[in-house]
Amino acid sequence: MNGNRVVVTGLGAVTPVGLDVASSWQAICDGKSGAASIEGFDTDAFSTQFSCSVKNFSTEGYLAPKDSKRMDPFIQFGMVAGIQAIRDSGLEITEANCERIGCAIGSGIGGIGSIERNNELILNAGPRRMSPFFVPGAIINMISGNLSVMYNLQGPNLAIVTACTSGTHNIGMGARLIATGEADAMLVGGAEMATT
């Protein structure tokens, strides 16, 4: 890829082995596994009873409780990692540069847990019981959308969905937008929470 030089200036991570970059990296270096018994639902009927899910996660210090309550966990993970990356970068977003800074964060499956819960709610209690926040709390582009609103990112805003490679494709797209001069900075990545 020719054009402007692309560099990484900030990192964020919410993983099965840590809730930020430092703790995740240390756990990886120490050879720790994120695999553990699945919590949150009965797994007796399933042959697999473990997953590599995020543990002990909280949005405290990142999102208002009212806002995080309306978000599927994958959005919470992506939001927290994105906030960490912005903080780590030291990037100052101003009225002068906000139109040149964008966001590209995707997910392979999005809010599958929210979709399952709302389907059950509709079947058991009827459609009027479904929350009006269901769709914005479960669709894949809401990580990019919410972070763009939070930080006034007015540049390119997208969420590429390509299954397990969604995060990689969003990182690549961000690099391409910078290299071609369509953006000066991009907040990029992926998030997932499919243990349901």
Regions found by a protein language model. Name each.
Residues 40-91, 140-154:
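A glycine- and small-residue-enriched flexible loop/hinge segment at structural boundaries
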Residues 2-3, 16-19, 29-38, 68, ...:
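Acyl-thioester C-C bond-transforming condensing/cleaving domain
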Residues 1-67:
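ACP-dependent fatty acid/polyketide chain-elongation machinery
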Residues 11, 106-108:
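Structured loops at beta-to-helix junctions and adjacent beta-edge loops in soluble globular domains
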